[in-house]
């Protein structure tokens, strides 16, 4: 038996050893004629065959050959703002594990949202197995190296739709249903790069459709076959020298949330780290010391010189914040070196991106999801924004001021806005959230959305000297100190952070992030977008004065020599609606509720309604924006607003203009309806009305919903000063009733809101009919029609017939594609891949 056993072992060895040598031979055969690049993982590039082979390390006991952070983006994009597939777009990063399963290599996205911090491996495994894993790709193993390395063809991994391009096209109503064409998709072998801590890949993705839609047709050479360049980075996991900082909602930081199922019963399962770069002092024993490795940003060398200089200047403002946090000379901004790939993870890049129309700017980047450590910043700035800003200021100041270099030079004001924009978007990548209350603190943060601060001077002219601020604000320094300050050993960091934030609150600084700042119906009285001033009501009065001066002077001076006069139809929009965002800000005083983000033990816990006298002042200011005299334009202006020529791909027509039903003649009534609808929508937002009702329940002396309705009714159903203004007043009456009917039919409105609104409409119907008996015949007809609409609304069965009047299409103020933030022409945001 022993002899037979020896014979069997000999035969097995004879079979296995040649197989091992054959695998090594396969490796040599596969790679012998290919270009080898040594790096984080070795690459073998097959230029003729269009393949990229990767040598992965020998698998561990769990079969994992490589664990890395993956970032995915677009080297070349679609160019459509609404769809958002821009050059430079990138996701926030994820950890991918390449695992050997049988004879295949499988790529798995690890789920770090759910984790266990315990040392017990079985506890960690229990959490890991409780939530679905994601296998995203598998490929054949081509060969095995002498030390167990595995040779894999990664070409199909690189050409899969890793960024969700098909979904983005499908989800947009003007995108279309596309399929990924395998024949027309391939890796860009020449673009593959290998470095010690990362490898970088580009691939051409071609998506085809038999029924492309308008947004793709407007930007692609052939909308039936759209080719984008997808970029994938694989990055070495950071070492263990980074110390995460727990997120504090009071700090102005950005959170990286997760669930830790190892948390004790006395703790919270839901937790979060603050997102930030790694900074370590050269000398940690002193309060202020340069960092061992500074943070360096690089500006796209493809930006025009004056833009590039403005971007560098604005982004450089953050050096002051880092100095305040104890890191002098630890942050700088330079021009991207020639030949550097903007999506290479070694570079924090500010990209200047071109699109068909103006659009949003983004500040995001690559984050280690395990710790919140920021590894690469990625800022996208749209090139058409600055041109839109210049046009707006030419509408306010006159195009004759362009190029003068004076304080009212539209180009210089627009460049000031670009500096602010660069600082804002870089701020997001550094870990700072929006602070939409900063405008109420003397522009205390670049993380607000800044409206231009323009005044009517004593001479009656517009003063642009303070249009945009320079440098970071006081809140930015506080937030940077909380996020980046490195404390001496033995310091209670939580207590030190609390002391810093409490001192900031004591000085009057406020912080309010997106959920309570963006929406028109939100409650915080000092948190809005594109507003100005510590007193939003006083600021609205100032803005209305600026608007009046600009409209009184509006004419051909708003155009540069040689521009078509029809362009005035585009310029008039932001001037006529110049008050739109300050209206929203003032409306937040009505039914407003002041509060701070706080923790138990803080001195400033709780909230309180806005004092009733301030609410009444806001109501009066808002109702004044409905004055027909404020919404009318003189004939000399109206007759200059001739229609544009519709040219190449519809250029000259579309969303940037007021809608209208009068053909070539400018439709003033629709413009007035548009402006009035902004005010009425803000006043009668379902959330605001619900708060008014609740506040009155708690305090009978509060401003009530009925008070608001009565003041608006008195303004809209009184006598017009002139027959000319009567037409505007009638259109506003229609919009008012329509808004109330829509409010009562809104499924998100509270029962109290619906009940009180319907009761008011019933009474209003009786009042306007009784008044109309002595009125102008046109007034009689309009009021009878309004009464019929109200009766039809009250009598109709469920579901309601809405809308009760056609909606007016409001030209975009925010960059096109704004979505929830719509409601600026001076804008920016981070739609962040966060």
What are these regions (language model features)?
Residues 335-353, 416-472:
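The catalytic-center signature of Zn2+-dependent metalloproteases
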Residues 9-18:
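Bacterial N-terminal signal peptides
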Residues 59-61, 304-330:
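Zn2+-dependent metallopeptidase catalytic core
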Residues 89, 268, 301, 305-313, ...:
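Soluble non-cytosolic domains of exported or imported proteins
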Residues 441-834:
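Conserved catalytic/binding loops enriched for acidic/polar residues
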Residues 316-327, 355, 427-428, 432, ...:
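Sec-exported extracytoplasmic/periplasmic mature domains
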Residues 23-303, 321, 335-388, 393-410, ...:
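Auxiliary tRNA-acceptor-end handling modules of aminoacyl-tRNA synthetases
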Residues 1-9:
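Bacterial N-terminal signal peptides that target proteins for export
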């Amino acid at each position: 038996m022993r002899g037979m056993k020896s014979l069997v072992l000999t035969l097995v060895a004879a079979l296995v050893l040649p197989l091992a040598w054959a695998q090594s031979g396969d490796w040599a055969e596969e790679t012998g004629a290919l270009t080898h690049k040594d790096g984080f993982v070795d690459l073998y590039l097959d230029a003729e065959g269009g393949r990229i082979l990767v040598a992965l390390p020998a698998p561990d006991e769990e079969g994992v050959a490589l664990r890395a952070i993956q970032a995915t983006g677009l080297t070349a994009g679609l160019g459509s703002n609404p769809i958002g597939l821009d050059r430079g777009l990138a996701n926030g990063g994820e950890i991918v594990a390449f695992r050997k399963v049988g004879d295949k290599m499988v790529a798995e996205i690890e789920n770090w949202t759910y984790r266990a911090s315990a040392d017990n491996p079985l506890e960690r495994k229990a959490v890991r197995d409780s939530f679905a894993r994601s296998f995203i790709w598998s490929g054949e193993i081509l060969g095995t190296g002498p030390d167990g390395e595995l040779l894999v063809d990664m070409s199909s991994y690189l050409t899969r739709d890793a960024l969700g391009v098909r979904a983005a096209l499908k989800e947009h109503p003007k995108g279309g249903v596309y399929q990924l064409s395998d024949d027309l998709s391939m890796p860009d072998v020449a673009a593959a790069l290998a470095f010690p801590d990362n490898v970088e890949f580009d691939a051409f993705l071609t998506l085809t459709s038999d029924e492309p839609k308008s947004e793709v047709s407007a930007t692609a050479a052939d909308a039936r076959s759209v080719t984008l360049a997808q970029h994938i980075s694989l990055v070495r996991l950071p070492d263990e020298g980074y110390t995460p900082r727990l997120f504090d909602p009071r700090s102005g930081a950005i959170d990286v949330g997760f669930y830790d199922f190892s948390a004790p019963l006395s703790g919270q399962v839901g937790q979060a780290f603050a997102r930030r770069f790694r900074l370590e002092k050269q000398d940690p024993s002193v309060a202020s010391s340069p960092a061992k490795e500074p943070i360096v940003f690089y500006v796209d060398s493809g930006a025009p010189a004056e833009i590039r200089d403005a971007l560098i200047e604005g982004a450089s403002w953050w050096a002051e914040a880092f100095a305040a946090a104890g890191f002098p000379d630890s942050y700088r901004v330079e021009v991207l070196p020639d030949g550097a790939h903007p999506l290479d993870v070694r570079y924090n890049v500010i990209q200047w991106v071109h699109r068909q129309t103006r659009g949003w700017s983004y500040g995001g980047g690559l984050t280690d999801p395990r710790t919140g450590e920021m590894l690469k910043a990625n800022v996208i700035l749209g090139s058409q924004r600055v041109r839109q800003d210049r046009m707006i200021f030419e509408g306010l100041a006159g195009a004759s001021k362009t190029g003068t270099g004076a304080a009212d030079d539209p180009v210089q004001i627009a460049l000031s806005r670009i500096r602010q924009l660069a600082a804002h978007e870089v701020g997001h990548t550094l870990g700072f959230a929006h602070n939409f209350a900063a405008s109420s603190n003397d522009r205390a943060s670049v993380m607000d959305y800044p409206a231009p601060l323009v005044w009517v001077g004593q001479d009656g002219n517009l003063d642009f000297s303070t249009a945009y601020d320079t440098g970071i604000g006081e809140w930015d320094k506080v937030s940077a100190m909380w996020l980046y300050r490195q404390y001496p050993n033995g310091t209670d960091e939580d207590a030190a952070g609390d002391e810093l934030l409490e001192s900031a609150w004591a000085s009057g600084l406020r912080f309010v992030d997106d959920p309570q700042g963006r929406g028109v119906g939100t409650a915080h009285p000092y948190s809005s977008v594109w507003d100005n001033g510590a007193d939003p009501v006083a600021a609205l009065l100032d803005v209305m004065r600026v608007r009046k001066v600009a409209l009184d002077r509006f004419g051909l001076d708003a155009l540069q020599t040689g521009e078509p006069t029809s362009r005035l139809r585009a310029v008039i929009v932001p001037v006529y609606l110049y008050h739109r965002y300050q209206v929203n800000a003032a409306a937040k005083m009505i039914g407003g509720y002041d509060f701070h983000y706080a923790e138990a033990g803080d001195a400033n816990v709780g909230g309180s309604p806005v004092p009733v006298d301030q609410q009444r002042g806001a109501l009066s200011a808002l109702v004044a924006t409905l004055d027909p005299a404020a919404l009318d334009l003189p004939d000399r202006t109206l007759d200059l607003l001739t229609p544009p020529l519709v040219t190449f791909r519809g250029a000259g027509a579309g969303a940037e203009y007021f809608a209208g039903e009068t053909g070539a003649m400018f439709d003033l009534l629709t413009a007035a309806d548009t402006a009035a609808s902004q005010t009425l929508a803000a006043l009668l937002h379902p959330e605001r009305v619900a708060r008014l009702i609740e506040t009155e329940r708690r305090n009978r002396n509060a401003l009530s919903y009925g008070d608001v309705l009565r003041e608006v009714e008195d303004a809209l159903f009184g006598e017009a000063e002139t027959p000319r203004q009567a037409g505007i007043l009638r259109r506003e009456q229609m919009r008012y009733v329509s808004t109330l009917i829509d409010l009562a039919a809104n499924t998100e409105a509270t029962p109290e809101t619906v009940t009180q609104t319907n009761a008011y409409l019933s009474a209003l119907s009786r009042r306007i009919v009784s008044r109309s008996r002595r009125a102008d015949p046109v007034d009689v007809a309009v009021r009878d029609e309004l009464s019929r609409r109200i009766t039809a609304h009250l009598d109709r069965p469920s579901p309601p017939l809405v809308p009760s009047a056609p909606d007016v299409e409001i030209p975009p103020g925010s960059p096109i594609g704004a979505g929830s933030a719509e409601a600026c022409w001076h804008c920016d945001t981070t739609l962040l891949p966060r």
